Amino acid sequence: MDHSDLGSAYEIEKQVNPSPWSKDNFYSSFDVGHHSLVCRIDSKIIGFVIFSLIKQESHLLNIGVAKDWQRKGAGAMLLKSLIKQSKVLGAKKVFLEVRSKNDNAIFFYTKYNFLKDAIRANYYSGSDPDDAILMSLEI
């Protein structure tokens, strides 16, 4: 993802995330050097993933696919690309947090062999508070 992609990716973020990152948080993630990838169809961004790398751990910070393109392989492509890129960058593990109420996402990550490691109580605040399930994948 480059700076010119941020607006399109942020529009997807607002569309699909029940508690979206603020615009400042979204843009500052790019500015601080987090890694990011986009999925495009005919030059239109239909999905994105943002992750950080600390030593040998890759942290999936945010992923989103436009509603019209969900369940059509874009999320899988983004996740597989994140895993591959993380390996290239030297990571041995990918971890993430997911809302405990988000059964579709939990199923999706489990399908790609992520394991449930722990629960963080009251991790998500705002209008839809929720616990987070911590998941990880050895790569």
Predicted regions and their residues:
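Acetyl-CoA-dependent GNAT
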Residues: 3-68, 79-81, 85, 89, ...
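Conserved catalytic-core motifs of GNAT/GCN5-like acyltransferases
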Residues: 97, 110, 115-131
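Conserved acetyl-CoA-binding loop-helix of GNAT-fold acetyltransferases
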Residues: 71-86, 107-111
